[in-house]
């Protein structure tokens, strides 16, 4: 099982665009309905910082191969004030995590 947390900060004028890319990824995930990946995206209180959490069996290809995900990540650095940093993690505990 692979678990990754990604954090970055976009410029204020690109925050809505970034959020639109993220929404497109979730629309494609809903259509494809892969069972080997869990994925969550969060916008932090400042409105420009984002966190993504992924848990996947294998490498996460069900997510990373989606056309919307490729479009989202293709030029993400152009939107960023602070570039993405990825960190693998191990969960310590969780309870009913989120409802969207």
Predicted regions and their residues:
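Short, well-ordered beta-strand segments in beta-rich or mixed alpha/beta enzyme
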Residues: 2-9, 37-67, 100
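A general secondary-structure junction signal
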Residues: 43, 88-91
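Residue-level signal for secondary-structure boundary sites
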Residues: 14-16, 60, 94
């Amino acid at each position: 099982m692979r678990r990754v947390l990604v954090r970055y900060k976009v410029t204020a004028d690109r925050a809505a665009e970034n959020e639109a890319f993220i929404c497109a990824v979730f629309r494609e995930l809903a259509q494809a309905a892969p069972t080997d990946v869990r994925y969550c995206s969060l916008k932090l209180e400042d409105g420009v910082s984002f966190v993504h959490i992924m848990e996947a069996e294998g490498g996460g290809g069900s997510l990373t191969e989606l056309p919307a995900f490729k479009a989202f990540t293709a030029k993400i650095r152009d939107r960023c004030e602070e570039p993405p940093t990825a960190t693998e993690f191990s969960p310590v505990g969780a309870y009913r995590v989120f409802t969207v």
